[in-house]
């Protein structure tokens, strides 16, 4: 383990790949052919209006709901059918923006609070742009 307790597997593997994920509810497409590549150790924030599919995508990645089409790969291993607890053991985690957790913080403050965990150098954190 490293100084911040990152599992060996998390340090020495590729990352998360979302390939062509589609999800519909009652014939309405919520996600349409979404693809995304994330490296291990990256902090990611999805920003968008209500109903854009952000939470749906995170729930699919974590295994809380099933996608209609597409693949979720972790370190090149297909995990789309794995239960949530197995994905968690493989190093996946999800921290939703809930008012009960981040009272009084705006979106930018929420993102910077996560960066404090992943980037210890205050000056490097400030150089990261939040859009």
Residue ranges and their predicted role:
Residues 104-112:
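Short coil-to-helix segment of the ABC ATPase nucleotide-binding domain corresponding to the Q-loop/switch region
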Residues 109, 117-131:
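Short coil-to-helix "N-cap" segments within the ABC nucleotide-binding domain's helical subdomain
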Residues 78-98, 122-125:
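ABC ATPase NBD coupling module
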Residues 62:
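Helix-to-loop junction immediately C-terminal to a conserved catalytic motif
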Residues 47-49:
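The feature captures the beta-strand-to-loop junction immediately N-terminal to the Walker
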Residues 71-73, 77-78:
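ATP-binding/catalytic-site motifs of ATP-hydrolyzing domains
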